Regions:
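Extended active-site neighborhood of metal-dependent phosphoesterases/phosphodiesterases
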Residues: 1, 48-145, 149, 176-188, ...
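Acidic, histidine-bearing metal-coordination/catalytic regions of metal-dependent phosphoesterases
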Residues: 1-8, 13, 24-30
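The substrate-binding groove and active-site-proximal loops of carbohydrate-active enzymes
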Residues: 8-14, 39-49, 75-76, 122-133, ...
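Solvent-exposed loop/turn segments at secondary-structure junctions
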Residues: 12-15, 40-43, 74-78, 105-107, ...
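Active-site metal-binding motif and surrounding structural segment of the metallo-beta-lactamase
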Residues: 26-44
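Short acidic, glycine-rich surface-loop motifs adjacent to enzyme active sites
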Residues: 41, 144-166
Length: 208
């Protein structure tokens, strides 16, 4: 299957009317799969709240018969049930980052972690997203040199916090992953987080 349609939602922040309005624009368009690109089930306080919003998202897009992929945003990492939220998802490769093929297209998904340093006082020394990002250096290196990536006719990079064009003072992802991504022949990088539309042409921000 070379031609397909995917729906990508992000930064819903548990605001059901936003999802309803967005889905209303595409409800009559046949689609093959759905991606929730972070900050959709944010700041989960408990299992009941998390399950309610997960069920609503899946029900709205028909995830009983259409695959739905969930990427973690920085807000899914916060609040009392954030550690339990992980158990509600069947991640590709059982990690919060990974890759998969859809037809002749290769999708690579990265977990950018938090948008603040691990040393930020509100984390009380419990976070190690620096380690998570370093783990993904090894993942990326293997993925980009792998057969499935090289043989794909199109390649899509998905991540929540923009690797290019974010503008935050704290940008660890470009520092760690930039040299690998600079040589990677992705056709498009789709990110989220900023709550505003932006298009950055190839090469305009060091993006390949």
């Amino acid at each position: 299957q070379k031609d397909f349609t995917a729906l990508i939602f992000n930064d819903l922040h548990k605001h059901i009317p936003t999802l309803d309005a967005l889905y209303g624009q595409v409800r009559d368009i046949p689609y093959d799969f759905v991606v929730f690109n972070g900050d959709c089930i944010d700041d989960p306080a408990n299992e009941k709240e998390a399950l309610y919003h997960l069920a609503y998202l899946c029900g709205k897009v028909g995830a009983s018969h259409v695959p739905a992929f969930f990427l973690r945003g920085n807000h899914e990492i916060r609040n009392a049930y954030s550690i339990g939220l992980r158990a509600l998802f069947d991640y590709v490769g059982d990690k919060t980052y990974g890759a998969f093929n859809w037809g002749d297209t290769r999708f690579v998904m990265l977990d950018c972690g938090e948008d603040k340093p691990d040393s930020t006082w509100v984390y009380y020394g419990l976070n190690d997203f620096t380690g998570l990002r370093k783990d993904q250096v090894n993942f990326l290196s293997k993925e980009l040199s792998g057969k499935e990536f090289k043989q794909a006719s199109k390649r899509v990079l998905l991540n929540h916090i923009p690797i290019y064009g974010n503008g935050d003072a704290y940008e660890p992802c470009p520092e760690l992953w930039g040299s690998l991504l600079a040589k990677a022949p992705f056709n498009v990088n789709i990110s989220a987080h900023t709550h505003q539309y932006a298009f950055h042409p190839k090469g305009s921000l060091g993006n390949n």
